[in-house]
Amino acid sequence: MSSWSMPSFAGRRRAVLRLLCRSLLALGVGAAVASYSSAALARDTVSIGYQRSSTLFILLKRNGELERRLGVLGYDVRWHEFSSGLLEAMNSGSVDLNADVADAFALFTQAAHAPLTYYAEETSAPSAQAIIVPANSPIHGVADLRGKRVAVAKGSGCHYLLLAALKRAGLAPGDVDIRYLEASDALAAFRGGNVDAWVIWDPFLAAEQRDDHVRVIADGRDGLAEYNRFYTATDAFVERHPDALRAVFELLNQTGRWVKAHPEEAAKILAPVWGNLPEATVTLANSRRSYEIVPVRRDQLAEQQRIADTYRAAGMIPVAVKATDIRIWTPGPTGAAAAVKAKAP
């Protein structure tokens, strides 16, 4: 079995509303040194937070293209890998940009009024998460989950998929025995027969399917759960460095298209990063992701509102959230970055 593991979801909903001060560089002495120091001070640093699951940033970090593109613009790049706490780092201003997070998680930062701006979206991948059961299970549909033990990561996109699937099948959350387990614990429980079903995302889903001992009884298709992913940046960074943000957006878009055009090559790179998964498993997982990077549109956030309303009703979000009440950055139509849009009324 592979050593793949995902960062814990515990604590991702906490938000710390403060920004860290940056230290000043020492001044040079003498005209030549002062000139050198001024050039150094003119350069800024883009701090990027990512995880092992952050496909596009992983590839950009490996090929060095982001450093080259931003270097021309006068920026250095600093990478910060997180096993957990990425959103807290964003909320506190410890990093300027974050890698993609699933639709549901973005809502928790919004509910906490974190000073974040949405700058890109990966379009929907509805089959990249699913409800699975053992191949020999008597469960053949969501309605059969009544009274059964179902493992899911609390507050994840999969949690929304489960709640939406239960509602469509005429079941309430209390009609099933929901076990809140992180992915690694859920994997052990599922394979050990301690839960009857598991709601999980790729590449865990692909790994289980490749082992050929599971069946999918529902995924996000047929309008059940779109499973979009969002990229966010601190408000301060967006307002001060739109040129850098545009370069990042363009490179994410290009890299996403490269992954879809070169699935085998991408799998060779990602397999060891993802815990030495078989390349075929990575290819299967990536085949279900769109990797289509587009600007975020306020008029296309209906799914976010459905998730927010569902989580509010389930008591997971303490306040009502209006999905369109966010800050959005979009690339300018003529090459210059557009200004950050104001909050929707």
Give the ranges of each region predicted by the language model.
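N-terminal export leaders
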Residues: 13-25
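Short, glycine-/small- and polar/acidic-enriched structural segments
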Residues: 42-172, 178-180, 196-202, 225
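Secondary-structure end/capping motifs
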Residues: 239-318
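Pocket-lining segment of extracytoplasmic ligand-binding domains
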Residues: 101-104, 178-179, 184-273
